């Protein structure tokens, strides 16, 4: 499928919508379901778009009354996401490692923090991911996932007869980085400057020093790199097969 270039002309990739909500919203809902509600967004390209979205979030979510006489506005929907969202402009051309370094002063007192890409969803159990990281006593934990193959596979026998056809089987391509990390603050020692690509020097250094733990996630995961990926996620939503929406599946 073609890249998301048309979608990202006027908005950053995490703001591309799946089911009328930005993909970053879906990611935040996953964390919130597991009780994690403090978010720091590393903004760069079109950062004002992200700021505007969250600035208007309450207004767009609720019925609202404007009292012009008293200069008041009242929201009329009871349930609100208990989120605390900090948006940090980390620069237009900063690489992934540099972006992480720029939010260092916004982190709380905990020794560890989550770091997640803004273009993929999954039904990752965030609490199990954290527990796995803490038990490892390592600086970083990466979630390994088994993406669906992009094409169906044909299996032939020795005589060239077609034995079976698998429609885009799960995990045919092997384990890949799913973009859901837990990091100890010691990671900042491994990030040199704005040009540091997190997936290169820092992660390779951790791996060489046996400081990179892996959490294996065998269930649903899907990145959104292309228009086809976006359409696939929307199709899953329409057919009530959005496995990443654990907050909907497990409503009491």
Give the label of every model feature segment.
Residues 23-27, 99-102, 202:
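Well-ordered alpha-helical segments embedded in enzymatic catalytic cores
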Residues 9, 19, 36, 108-109, ...:
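Short conserved AdoMet
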């Amino acid at each position: 499928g073609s890249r998301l270039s048309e979608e990202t002309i006027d908005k950053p990739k995490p703001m591309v919508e799946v089911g009328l909500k930005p993909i970053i919203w879906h990611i935040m809902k996953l964390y919130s379901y597991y009780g994690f509600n403090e978010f720091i967004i590393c903004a760069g390209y079109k950062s004002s778009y992200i700021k505007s979205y969250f600035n208007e979030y309450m207004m767009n979510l609720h019925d609202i009354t404007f009292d012009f006489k008293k200069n008041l506005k009242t929201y009329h929907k009871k349930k609100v996401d208990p989120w605390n969202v900090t948006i940090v402009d980390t620069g237009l051309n900063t690489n992934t490692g540099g972006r992480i370094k720029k939010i260092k002063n916004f982190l709380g007192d905990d020794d560890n923090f989550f770091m997640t890409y803004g273009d993929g969803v999954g039904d990752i159990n965030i609490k199990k991911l954290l527990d796995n990281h803490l038990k490892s006593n390592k600086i970083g934990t990466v979630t390994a996932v088994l993406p669906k193959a992009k094409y169906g596979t044909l299996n032939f026998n020795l005589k060239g007869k077609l034995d079976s056809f698998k429609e885009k089987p799960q995990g045919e391509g092997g384990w890949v980085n799913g973009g859901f990390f837990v990091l100890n603050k010691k990671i900042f020692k491994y990030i040199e400057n704005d040009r540091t690509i997190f997936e290169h020097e820092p992660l390779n250094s951790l791996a060489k020093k046996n400081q990179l733990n892996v959490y294996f996630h065998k269930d649903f995961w899907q990145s959104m790199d292309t228009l086809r990926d976006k359409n696939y996620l929307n199709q899953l939503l329409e057919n009530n097969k959005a496995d990443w929406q654990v907050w909907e599946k497990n409503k009491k």
